[in-house]
């Protein structure tokens, strides 16, 4: 029997021959219901009547088409001689009860029961009068598939592993899931094994704690929402969805660790973390919905005081060029210089501005250093494909606005000079006092940082700050995209249509 099934690949269940192989496997599993022990079941060849019976139960479709991890489920049972692991003497085991309870409460982990066969298991185990062999085998595999799926989702986030992932990555992901499943079955520790898969980030843990608090809320408003009686109660639905989406973002996080700078784009703030605590923070201004600040990682090795602003071409041709055509003094009044393709500074009067347009603009425009400069007095550069950086600004009143998605994409830092002083503390080359002295010279200078610091630009619409969870506007509409990807396009979740109305616009 094992040799017959050795070529089984669930991705090809639509193939009649392979489907028959899998049905034969089900018959083998129906030869007896044993506790997980490693005993090999009978190798008798099933009769045609047995195969026909299972095929009739299957009602013309593959019995396990709904499994997310069909190949792993098969591999697990193959490794364990096709012995059921969630049943004992035709009764769901205590392990099965624990797993079913976990699935019913999986919302507390930011996941949804519908993704883990909750409805099908409900029908099989609670709506059926008798637990026949079909119910035992199918429910056993559904529970196994649910465990593997939850294990993956907690460790890697709700994502689809695709052809873009390397074979080594896929093998590693699958091997980890199988090891955890085997350990769970042997040790009867479902919850602890699964919780080991979760991120250790403090932000994730605090969001999870807040979500659990809401879900366990005994208020009538909370119960009404969770029971589907209302779609949104005092923003409860939006908060639940935001918590779930951002917990999933932290599951996918891998770059943030140790000493680092985090910029939260929707939150409009910057935090510098050392030794697991925030030691510096500042308000920031980020890109508009049209000119979005990207999610990225970088490393700040130095910063520049009294920087030039090399105006991006899009701004030069779309904003500055029309002004220069209307006003011959515009460039001079705003301290702009015009550079030739060779980098030479040109006099504005030597240029025929009326002949220029976006397809004919061979010049570079830069703004001179000084208090008038749009970058302010300090610029923190780090390599990235978007030419985005952190900088000071001469428009400081904008920080008082609640909604601060106002820039062309770069991040304006309210306490930019304080950040510069902080980064040179203990610097072998330049001290904070030296920096203050250099600023008095009003000359451009590059300051090296002895200990370069990673910087992470992230999109988080809720976060734990100052002892409470804060919720932020979905300024770029990214939450809606994540929601559709996580829940909206999954046919299993269609019953939970109430949830979608909790998403912030």
Language-model segments: residues:
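N-terminal secretory signal peptides that target proteins for export/translocation
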Residues: 1-17
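Well-ordered beta-sheet/strand-loop patches within structured domains
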Residues: 34-72, 76-79, 148, 164-172, ...
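Generic detection of long, well-ordered alpha-helical segments
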Residues: 17, 93, 133-144, 197, ...
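Sec-dependent signal peptide recognition
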Residues: 18-25
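C-terminal motif of bacterial Sec signal peptides marking the signal peptidase cleavage site
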Residues: 30-32
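Enrichment for repetitive, rod-forming helical segments
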Residues: 26-28, 419
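Cationic-aromatic interfacial patches
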Residues: 34-171
């Amino acid at each position: 029997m094992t040799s017959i099934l050795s070529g089984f690949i669930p991705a090809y269940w639509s193939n009649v021959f392979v489907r028959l192989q899998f049905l034969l496997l089900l018959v083998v599993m129906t030869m007896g219901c044993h506790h997980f022990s490693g005993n090999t079941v009978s190798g008798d060849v099933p009769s045609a009547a047995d195969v026909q019976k299972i095929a009739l139960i299957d009602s013309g479709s593959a019995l396990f088409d709904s499994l997310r991890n069909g190949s792993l489920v098969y591999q697990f049972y193959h490794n364990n001689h096709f012995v059921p692991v969630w049943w004992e003497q035709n009764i769901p085991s205590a392990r099965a009860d624990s797993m079913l309870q976990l699935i019913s409460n999986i919302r507390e982990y930011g996941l949804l029961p519908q993704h883990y066969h909750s409805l099908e298991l409900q029908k099989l185990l609670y709506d059926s009068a008798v637990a026949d062999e079909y119910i035992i085998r199918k429910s056993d595999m559904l529970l196994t598939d649910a465990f593997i799926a939850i294990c993956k989702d907690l460790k890697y986030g709700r994502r689809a592993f695709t052809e873009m992932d390397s074979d080594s990555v896929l093998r590693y992901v699958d091997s980890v899931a199988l090891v955890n499943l085997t350990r769970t079955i042997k040790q009867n520790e479902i919850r602890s094994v699964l919780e080991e898969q979760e991120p250790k980030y403090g932000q994730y843990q605090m969001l999870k704690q807040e979500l659990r608090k809401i879900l366990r809320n005994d208020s009538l408003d909370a119960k009404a929402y969770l029971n589907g009686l209302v779609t949104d109660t005092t923003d409860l639905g939006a908060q639940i969805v935001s918590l779930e989406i951002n917990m999933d973002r932290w599951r996918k996080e891998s770059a943030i660790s140790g000493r680092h700078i985090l910029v939260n784009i929707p939150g409009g703030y910057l935090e510098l973390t050392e030794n697991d605590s925030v030691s510096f923070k500042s308000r920031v201004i980020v890109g508009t919905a049209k000119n979005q600040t990207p999610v990225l990682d970088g490393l700040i090795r130095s910063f520049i005081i009294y920087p030039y602003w090399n105006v991006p071409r899009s701004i030069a041709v779309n904003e500055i060029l029309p002004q220069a055509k209307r006003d011959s003094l515009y460039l001079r009044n705003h301290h702009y210089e015009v550079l030739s393709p060779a980098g030479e500074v040109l006099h504005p009067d030597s240029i025929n501005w009326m002949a220029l347009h976006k397809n004919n603009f061979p010049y570079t425009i830069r703004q001179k250093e000084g208090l008038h400069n749009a970058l302010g007095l300090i610029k923190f550069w780090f390599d990235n494909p978007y030419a985005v950086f952190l900088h000071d600004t001469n428009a400081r009143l904008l920080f008082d606005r609640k909604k601060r998605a106002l820039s062309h994409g770069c991040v304006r830092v309210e306490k930019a000079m304080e950040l510069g002083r902080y980064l040179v503390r203990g610097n072998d080359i330049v001290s904070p006092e030296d920096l203050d002295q250099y600023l008095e010279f009003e000359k451009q200078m590059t300051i090296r940082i002895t200990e370069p610091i990673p910087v992470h630009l992230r999109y988080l619409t809720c976060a734990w700050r100052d002892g409470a969870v804060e919720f932020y506007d979905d300024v770029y509409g990214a939450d809606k995209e994540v929601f559709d990807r996580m829940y909206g396009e999954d046919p299993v979740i269609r019953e939970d249509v109430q949830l979608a109305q909790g998403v912030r616009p």
